Amino acid sequence: MEEIFISILNLISNEIPQLSLVDEDYGQLETSEDTYPVTFPCALIGNMEADWEEIGMGTQKGIVTLTTRLAIDCYEDTHIGSGTTEKVAERLRLANQLYTTLQCSRHSDDMGPMFRTKTKCYSLPGMIKVYEYVFQFELHDDSAAKD
């Protein structure tokens, strides 16, 4: 699973160079500190979960769920009439770029393509906008199989 995770991080970093940080999500946006331990815009990948089905002989097939979060600081005044409403469109384009980068991507011979299953947008304290995408893919794991 680690090779898949690292491959996803590398793909995002290579395809979206305007991100200042691409990292594993370990709660950086939920910190109680006054400042976030990340730079923006950033992509955080985590909350991996799998439901497994035994195939036999130590081999399993799983459906893996993975969450990606694009976080952007929003200090521009973007109300209608401000002249900076284009900033909203820029954020949405960047969020869509994260989605299209991962949609149908494969990161191992043992996995199927990644498909988006859920989208959620929300704000965090400190004027941070988060675009969250949940992806699923099938994974064939024979790491416990006896030779």
Predicted regions and their residues:
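Charged, amphipathic alpha-helical segments and their flanking helix caps
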Residues: 1-37, 44-147
